[in-house]
Amino acid sequence: MKLGIVIFPSKMIQDKANGLRKRYDPHYALVPPHITLKTPFEAQDEQLESIVNELHTIASKTNPFTLHVGKVGSFAPVNNVLYFKVEKTPELTFLNEEMHSGLFTQEREYAFVPHLTIGQGLSDAEHADVLGRLRMKDFYYEQPIDRFHLLYQLENGTWTVHETFRLGKGNN
């Protein structure tokens, strides 16, 4: 099965991102707007219990924190992905590092850049045009974060929540 680990922002932030994703992200219908803590990875059914237990441990070692989302960025020239920048807090860094060690030893394809994708798969010209327009707009949102989610991919390509993990001691 294919799994992923994410943080979902508030409905207000998701609505703002979805307003752009409808036009600029072909994966719009597959998964809600999110911040990826661990990119999709393959796991066997019998590994699921160990993964869930490890995520409970990680969540209990992480305090709730404030998510800061603002400005539009891009991964160009590596790829034409547009995103809302997410401030790299110590808690986000800790979560990402924990999800790439111990039980989770998958190689990283890219360095950890917390973000909320709003567009991908754009031509170079469309990417430059949209990026230029969005960089002129002022985006800034913040919200408390007290949980993350383990997702799994269904046969039709959509993602759904398998389990939610609350941050902080005594919450799991």
UniProtKB/Swiss-Prot annotation:
Protein source organism: Bacillus cereus (strain ATCC 14579 / DSM 31 / CCUG 7414 / JCM 2152 / NBRC 15305 / NCIMB 9373 / NCTC 2599 / NRRL B-3711)
As recorded in UniProt, its EC number(s) are 3.1.-.-
Cross-referenced Gene3D superfamilies: Cyclic phosphodiesterase
Key words, A-Z: Hydrolase
Q: Where is this motif: HXTX 2?
A: 115-118
* Enzyme superclass (EC): hydrolase
Q: Does the keyword Metal-binding apply?
A: no
Please list the residues that make up the active site.
34, 115
Listed name of the protein: Putative phosphoesterase BC_1225
Motif HXTX 1 extends across: 34-37
Coiled coil feature spans: none
Q: Name the Pfam families on file.
A: 2_5_RNA_ligase2
What HAMAP family would the database entry show? 2H_phosphoesterase_YjcG
GO MF term list: hydrolase activity, acting on ester bonds
List the taxonomic lineage. Answer: Bacteria, Bacillati, Bacillota, Bacilli, Bacillales
Q: Which family does it belong to?
A: Belongs to the 2H phosphoesterase superfamily. YjcG family.
